[in-house]
């Protein structure tokens, strides 16, 4: 039997760390197809913190791709599970036959599916990538992303799968200690990445609420982002008074981030694609509604779970927000498909499919 190899093809520290810890802590002990990893980037202590995994690290995306292609050619029975796929060389290998479709299974992370960049090199590459995506052996994704993908590639198998958000199920039934009232606190974006379109989002929040709300913008991740943080702060202060604007430029530990989220009344996410599911889950768990772009297909996942969805095109007010909070509080969180531990069984199914052990 050939053991499935998992590929983290781009150096995205936060997401890669989440995936590796999830596999180490939850899947590896009971499934031999959950232990082998090829990772773009440095070790950064992963080998020590994830002893249940066999990890190989590569200094660049190109070096990793070359190693994957060599393994694929050496053994055509070898299958790979790509977690997110931000590696140009791997898409090209799928097109050229270096990796065969039956060897290539892909968990869509959102940004690797959508064609959001206006850069010339991206506009040139997107059509090529789109053709390659139609040749994969199968995809795993959110309901919304599966729907989006199926419109382009109806012949490719798709299975429901959610990113393994770190969650404490015991908090699902956490009682609201006091009735929410007073000035709203709005979380804008889920990180400091430009894909959050912070400036556009701040303008939209100001247009809806004026300078009457507290605005919190978490920008501690990614690192080396000070110039963009300063740009967002400058624009924010042109819209909101200093006491109503909080730009968080330092990376936060999970418990501190969780505490921050629970101080908010509303999450505002203007990006037009699926991303930030972890933050969305933690907000929903705390009965905090989220505003989504109508072009963000994750609203389909929320609607499927009977969760209230607010859109950036809605007329928002404190009354609307409080009503959404009330509706969220009435939902049985233990049944939400994309919450822990409910997302575990689809992961076991995905491993069997990618390994060729399930029809």
Swiss-Prot record:
- What cellular-component terms does GO give this entry? plasma membrane
EC id: 2.4.1.325
Where is the protein localized?
Cell inner membrane
Q: Keywords of this protein's UniProt record, alphabetized?
A: Cell inner membrane, Cell membrane, Glycosyltransferase, Membrane, Transferase
Q: Give me any GO biological process, just one.
A: fucosylation
Q: In which pathway does it act?
A: Bacterial outer membrane biogenesis; enterobacterial common antigen biosynthesis
Which chemical reaction does it catalyze? beta-D-ManNAcA-(1->4)-alpha-D-GlcNAc-di-trans,octa-cis-undecaprenyl diphosphate + dTDP-4-acetamido-4,6-dideoxy-alpha-D-galactose = alpha-D-FucNAc4-(1->4)-beta-D-ManNAcA-(1->4)-D-GlcNAc-undecaprenyl diphosphate + dTDP + H(+)
Tell me the enzyme class.
Answer: transferase
Membrane topology, from the record? Peripheral membrane protein
Please tell me whether the keyword Glycosyltransferase is annotated for this protein: yes
Under the heading InterPro entries, the entry gives: WecF
Instruction: Cite the GO molecular-function annotations of the record.
Output: 4-acetamido-4,6-dideoxy-D-galactose transferase activity; fucosyltransferase activity
Summarize the protein's role.
Catalyzes the synthesis of Und-PP-GlcNAc-ManNAcA-Fuc4NAc (Lipid III), the third lipid-linked intermediate involved in ECA synthesis.
NCBIfam families xref list: PRK02797.1-2, PRK02797.1-3
Q: Which family does it belong to?
A: Belongs to the glycosyltransferase 56 family.
Q: What name goes with this protein?
A: TDP-N-acetylfucosamine:lipid II N-acetylfucosaminyltransferase
